Amino acid sequence: FGIGPGDSRFVDMVDAYDPMLRRKLLDSAKAAGVVCHEGVYIFFSGPSFETPAEIRAARVLGADAVGMSTAPETILARHAGLKVAALSLMTNYAAGLVPGALAHEQTLSVAATAADKVRLVLRTFLERCA
């Protein structure tokens, strides 16, 4: 990953998520009885919750969901020439959408509650990809 002639640090992200893998992932969720939605995911670096102003800006940009991961991992995987599909679990409402402060404990609780469903979707997906 050096700098110089032929440097390929700038990865084409036009089709960051492989259409066939996306379809398999959505079909796997449906087969597992888990509701999934497609949408525009915007990344803000953490480890901090977004501000209400950032959430308003994300909405203007067309975001359906906001998170602190997924995008950097996708860029790295695409740089390595890998096909990518992503599954993100929304664990809290964005800042300014509900009253009160956001808390990491809430995200951990929601993630723990949904863990079995996520495992089922991933297991079904991997079986379909084998």
Write out the residue ranges for each language-model feature.
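Glycine-rich phosphate- or other oxyanion-binding loops that anchor nucleotides, phosphorylated ligands
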Residues: 1-93, 98, 105-130
